[in-house]
From Swiss-Prot:
Example of a GO MF term: mechanosensitive monoatomic ion channel activity
Organism: Pseudomonas putida (strain ATCC 47054 / DSM 6125 / CFBP 8728 / NCIMB 11950 / KT2440)
Gene Ontology CC annotation, any one: plasma membrane
Described function: Channel that opens in response to stretch forces in the membrane lipid bilayer. May participate in the regulation of osmotic pressure changes within the cell.
Keywords tagged on the record: Cell inner membrane, Cell membrane, Ion channel, Ion transport, Membrane, Transmembrane, Transmembrane helix, Transport
Signal peptide: none
Protein name, entry field: Large-conductance mechanosensitive channel
InterPro entries: Mechanosensitive_channel_CS, MS_channel, MSC/AndL, MscL_channel
Primary localisation category: membrane
Length: 139
């Protein structure tokens, strides 16, 4: 029973749950970015370059023979994947930058010093008076 309780305590910890939510949202975000790149960015880019469909760009190293498929370098798909990565990396960078900015603002937020009590004010005045009297007595 001890191992089951340990696992339950581990799985319910906030960090594990937060990580799981982050992974799920990250996977969904990755699909959105892939669709954005493949369906929105690449078609106009291909049109500008001369009607090229990037996903079809490839170099055939060996032609297909019978049941053996062709050996190709699909560099068009690689270009799409690189663009996917750049967009995801930029989005993560912007998110981290925003979080860091919020953390800095929290840390920099000045705290107002507490108002001294009447007793502290009186003691400060007495100290200042004693300093003044001692300075006047010195030759």
């Amino acid at each position: 029973m001890g191992m089951l309780n340990e696992f339950k305590a581990f799985a319910v910890k906030g960090n594990v749950v937060d990580m799981a939510v982050g992974i799920i949202i990250g996977a969904a975000f990755g699909k959105i970015v892939s669709s954005f790149v493949g369906d929105v960015i690449m078609p106009p880019l291909g049109l500008l370059i001369g009607g090229v469909d990037f996903s079809d760009l490839a170099i055939t190293l060996k032609a297909a023979e019978g049941d053996v498929p062709a050996v190709v370098l699909a560099y068009g798909k690689f270009i799409q994947t690189v663009i996917d990565f750049v967009i995801v990396a930029f989005a993560i960078f912007m998110g981290v930058k925003a979080i860091n900015k919020l953390k800095r603002e929290e840390a920099v937020a000045p705290t107002t010093p507490p108002v001294p009590s009447a007793e502290e004010t009186l003691l400060t005045e007495i100290r200042d008076l004693l300093k003044t009297q001692n300075q006047n007595r010195l030759p």
